[in-house]
């Protein structure tokens, strides 16, 4: 009888908690996934007629990457470096870079980045001597007004939405 009395609780515990069937719930977050964090390459395929244009494009890529990663601090630093790299012949481009460098607010930086992209296009178009720069477009940016950006790769990494819509966009032109 004592034996049955001791075995009953053991059977009860093993019956209630001994199941190997476990429900697994996977949570996938579209935000910070290690593989999706964009990085700026140390070099790119495009070559330019002068060192200033190459430096400006490198800082532009770092700025774009910071916006893709929703990193206002890195975006401000890259914009400051871009502004310092510019000559005096590009006051509107320099102003857009200064606006971005003056804040860590990613939404404000993205708005100024759209204006910067419009201003930087003639510099890149006139200065590229080799390789390819991809002009990309997101039709949903700024309440469906759309906005462009430049990239050193054909792969879409959207600076206007970051990880919320990382691959929204398409290549609309190439500069060669």
Task: Please state what every model-predicted region is.
Residues 35-39, 46, 107-112, 140-141:
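N-terminal start-of-chain detector that recognizes signal peptides
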